[in-house]
Amino acid sequence: AMSTDPTLLDPGFRPGLEFGLYVVFAILGANMLNQGIWQRVYAADGEPTLRRSFGVAALTVVPMVLLAGLFGVAASGLGLVTPETQSVAFFLVVTEVLPETVAFVVVLLVVLLVMSSADTMLNAISSLVTVDLARLGAVEGGRSLRLLGRGLTVLVALGAIVIGAQGYSVLQLFLTADLLAAAVFVPLIWGLYAEGLTERGAMAGSLAGLAVGIAYFPMLRGVVTLVPGIGGLLPEPAMLPAFLGATGVSTLVTGLAVAVGSAGFEFEALSTEIRSFDEPTAEEPPATGEVSD
């Protein structure tokens, strides 16, 4: 790798440092909005278990990310990477270096991993929408909610298949979604703790951050320039200011919204206003488990 491109292992290579910095904001925002992670948070049997799980995961992910990065370095050193294939550098190295049998096993494990992640995300998205519909009173009854959840899972899966069939860059899709997450996650998390943050304040912070991020984001430049009168006002596209701007501006606007906000949300009300769908209502007595003839 060093003989091919000395910058691949140069710790002071500025483009590499910039990439690592904005990827931190991208992944942080994406994970804060990852409903699969929030499901695991609420599935933990207590705070000690949750802290221990996050600690083990944080220690485990470091060597995994380092190893994944080295696969990219190896792919570049072997001359396997092009702008169109840089997002699949891992598979390029596997198919080039490893025997076919080992490569098949690796690809099979990766497919199983993707299926597991997709299953988590599909269920998380459909359950999120289902819960909101139940909260709004649009759907009543456990059976109707189950059918709706299954139907939403199928629709989301079909949408993912349609998008995947277009041949878009995996890296481009991830970074586009991460930009949205980078602009939204601070108002979302801040709202869990700040009593003075209103819905409008959180929305203003999210939209302001997203506007700045899109203005700099290179991958959406072609779409943004289609808006009349916008093209000449856009700054030079760059990833680092896109993600830093999205997170920083949303944080700043959200902080201002908290400072000027007067509506105080009572978090104690959650214990009385929020209940599990499995809990019986006042009109519905709990089941006794007895079976009558």
List the predicted regions and their residue ranges.
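Membrane-embedded helix-loop-helix hairpins and adjacent transmembrane boundary segments
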Residues: 1-293
